[in-house]
Design a protein with these regions (language model features):
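A short SAM/SAH-binding and catalytic strip from SAM-dependent methyltransferases
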Residues: 165-179
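Conserved class I S-adenosyl-L-methionine
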Residues: 98-109
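Short alpha-helix
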Residues: 220-247
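Class I SAM-dependent methyltransferase Rossmann-like catalytic core
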Residues: 43-98
Length: 270
């Protein structure tokens, strides 16, 4: 299954996250629906520019040294530490004792790589494989073949090329109609570690879907998103994983995510 078919989105995954980079206040969520279909039925259409072109422009600026990093098409002049993610990646690198081989599901053109790399040990050899939609894969292969980034259309394709140490899903699973699909993929993969970050957790007793509203100053869009019950999600995963650490992203000064978003670093049960 490709990323495009898995996401079932009203809009591309990079667009789902783009406004967070430039709009500091949390997005607005309306409703609490038992099913994805109910939330999707209440979500409207969107109008936005060519996101790939904007992301590519930003990523090329980073590659050439004209920007420090890019977050969803917006470039930044100075490095910015994403402490929880860097800590998780550093832990994996130390635990595996070899090169750090990352499988980044929905990773655009390497935004997490470009932001994290300056803060990771320069002695760690990194390969960073990204699973994305076909247009991002094509752009990535054309423009970033001379970097540690590699681009694939499916997890299976990436796994056929090499084994990996960690599967990274940053701000992704809440926009999957069936998040369990990605959990199954993670379990079947070679990755002993699984990083879930920008993960929205609540203590409501059950999962629910809401309609996320993008601030009109960015663009007009509404789309469905899951909020996961913390205990229910952990019950779903704990048979296959043990928790290495659980970080509230609001403790990170540079977080651009609403309250309740966390990073989980999980290790497969031996």
């Amino acid at each position: 299954m490709t990323l495009k078919s898995a996401l079932r989105l009203v809009l591309p995954p990079v667009l789902v996250k783009a406004y967070r980079a430039v709009f500091p206040r949390p997005p607005e969520f309306r409703g609490a629906y038992k099913t994805w279909a109910e939330a999707k039925a209440r979500a409207g259409s969107y109008a936005a520019p060519d996101i790939l072109a904007r992301v590519l422009e930003g990523a090329l600026a980073v590659k050439s040294g004209r920007a420090a990093f890019e977050r969803d098409s917006v470039t930044f002049a100075r490095p910015e530490l994403n402490g929880p993610l860097v800590a998780a990646l550093s832990y994996v690198a130390s635990a595996t004792g070899g090169p750090l081989r990352v499988l980044d599901f929905g990773g655009a053109l390497g935004a997490s790589y470009w932001q994290s790399r300056p803060f990771l040990s320069p002695t760690v050899n990194i390969t960073w494989d990204i699973v994305e939609q076909p247009n991002f894969v094509a752009a990535g292969r054309e423009h970033f073949a001379d970097t540690p980034l590699r681009f694939f259309g499916t997890i299976q394709e990436a796994e056929a090329a090499t084994e990996h140490d960690v599967l990274l899903a940053s701000g992704v699973i809440q926009y999957l109609e069936n998040p369990g699909w990605l959990f199954d993929q993670a379990k079947a993969s070679s990755c002993p570690y699984f990083i879930l970050t920008r993960l929205p957790l609540q203590e409501t007793g059950s999962d629910y879907a809401a309609v996320e509203h993008v601030p009109p100053s960015i663009y007009q869009a509404t789309y469905p998103a899951w909020f996961f019950d913390r205990e229910a999600l952990w019950r779903r995963l704990r048979g296959d994983y043990e928790m290495v650490f659980d970080v509230d992203l609001q403790q990170n000064n540079n977080s651009v995510d609403p309250p309740g978003h966390v990073l989980w670093l999980l290790r497969k049960q031996r």
